[in-house]
Every structure is written in C-alpha cells, then in structure tokens.
Amino acid sequence: VYKRQMVSIVGRNGAGKSTLAKLICGFETPEQGQVLLNGRDLAQDNIRRRAQHIGYVMQNPNQMISKTMIFEEVALALQGSDMTQEQIRQRVEDTLKVCGLYPFRNWPISALSFGQKKRVTIASVLVQQPELIILDEPTAGQDFRHYTDIMEFLRGLNEQGVTVVMITHDMHLMLEYTPRALVFCDGQLIADRSAAAVLCDPELIEQAALKETSLFTLANRCGIAPAEDFVERFIHEDREVRTHGC
C-alpha cells in the first residue's frame, strides 16, 4: 500500500482480511514474513508504538469507546505522552474540528447517534496523527445519508494525506471510493487490481464469493466492451451528479 492511497480489502468471511489488519497493527504476530512501514520492519514495535503510525477503527464503535465524554475519549490516547495538557487540549480540539465534532466536544457520548460515535472512534485514532488508518466495515449499520457522510469524510481525510485501508463486504463502497482493491481467499492475496476490474471478472468474483455488480451485468447484456471502462465511467458520472447536481 502506498502513501495517500484509498484501498479496499475484500473477500469472503474467513478469507484473512481481519487477520491481516491484526498483523499490521501488532495484535497478532506473523509466523513468517515482515510488516514494513516506510521500509522499516515493525517487528520490534509494541502495539502502542505502532498506534502512533497505524490507526485501527473497529466495526462497532461501542467496542472501542471507554470514556463517558467525547473530549475525554479522544484525549485518552495522548495521556501518558510527553505532551503537556495544553498541547493535548489543542491537539484534541483540532482533531474534533476535522471530524466535525467540535460543537459536541463537551457532550456525553451517550447522546450521539451511531454514525457520530463512529466519528468519535475515528477521531480517537486521528488524534495520534497516524500515517495509515485501517477501518473494518466503516459504513456498517448506517443508512444511505450517513453512509455517504462517513465516506465523504474519509475521502476528505485521504485528500489531506492520510492513507485509508477499508475492510468491507460492500461492493458499491469499494467501487465508488477506492481505486484499488485487494482480494483475499483462504489467507492468500489472489488479486490486486482496480475495483472495476475486480467486479468485471466473473471467475474472480466466484472464487472470492463477491457480489457481481449490476453495472457489469448491464454492460454484458448491452454488448458494451470493455465493461470495466463502462463501470468506471458510470460511477464517475453518478458521483458528479450527486455532488454537483449536473
């Protein structure tokens, strides 16, 4: 994965997606091979040190949140660091502004919606200024409006220089938001291609138990070739219309 990329990791349940994330974050130790960040082997880094560079956001925000108040939750990762309390306050406030949570900084977390709690967990990771964020099913349990809000928020973070990796079963998310897709099956990486190329490959779809996009079906039935180009153009135009209204 390269800096400033936005990448999806897809595959059937048990394919190894979450295991890969745990290996990268240091929750599990690889039996062979290396985990490199900027060319440096992370084998000697403990979880806390890795968290300064790599953030992990779980699918259910309630499994990550441990404090009552928003400010306290986001500040938690910085406690015990070399930063002064004033530096921590400033870092937390800056992060809350980026995440659209600053107006709620003194609110109890219990007053937030599921989507807002999701942002709190992202803020608690971002406050450490990681180079890479890994998210497990970032839009799970959200309606379309909140789905769009969280994905546009993540796209904005990516445009600011944060590398974003998403573990997902949502093929539309993969297709619309991530130019690159990594496909896993039985613990092996079986494809590293564009999202459109993945979803226009029937054999790969079957092998990885992915869901064929209706756009690929439409392209085939209408005799449009190459289908990959049609899918990419359609997604681009659809995003432009929803974003700009024309």
Pin down the residues of each PLM region.
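Conserved beta-strand-loop-alpha-helix hinge in the C-terminal portion
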Residues: 188-215
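Conserved ABC transporter NBD signature motif
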Residues: 33-41, 50
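Catalytic Walker B motif of ABC-type/P-loop ATPase nucleotide-binding domains
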Residues: 133-136
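Conserved ABC ATPase signature
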Residues: 108-112
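Conserved ABC ATPase "signature" region
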Residues: 86-104
